[in-house]
């Protein structure tokens, strides 16, 4: 992949879907994958991704937040050009809506991911 290709940051904490890297690369993205939000934030401070694709999980026992993504989304807000795509379980849509009321999320797709839907979103953003 060309070094000047736009960076897509894939944040995978749940591993609940197939490897999407080949799709991202076919669409012309340079891909960085992190398996922890804190490592993704560290990478975002070094490089500015064009797109962030992150999985969302809701845990009712979180006292001070809705999900795993608050810190990541707060960091992403500083880069107005970055597009944020969240992958989520349909049963957690209510929690995702709470998160959307506080942070910009450009698109959200339910799991299991349908590659044609993901491809359509990412193609539109290129």
Spans of model-derived segments:
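Acidic, metal-coordinating helix/loop segments flanking the phosphotransfer/catalytic sites
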Residues: 35-51, 57-61
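Short helix-loop-beta junction
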Residues: 22-30
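Conserved phosphotransfer microenvironments
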Residues: 51-79, 89, 95
């Amino acid at each position: 992949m060309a070094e000047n290709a736009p960076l897509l940051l894939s944040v995978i904490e749940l591993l609940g879907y197939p490897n999407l890297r080949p799709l991202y690369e076919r669409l012309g993205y340079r891909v960085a994958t992190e398996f922890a939000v804190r490592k993704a934030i560290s990478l975002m401070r070094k490089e500015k991704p064009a797109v962030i694709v992150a999985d969302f999980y809701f845990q009712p026992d979180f006292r001070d937040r809705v999900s795993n993504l608050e810190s990541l989304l707060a960091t992403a807000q500083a880069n107005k050009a970055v597009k944020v795509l969240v992958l989520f379980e349909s049963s957690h849509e209510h929690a995702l809506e709470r998160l959307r009321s506080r942070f910009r999320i450009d698109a959200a797709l339910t799991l299991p991911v349908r590659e044609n839907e993901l491809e359509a979103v990412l193609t539109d953003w290129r």
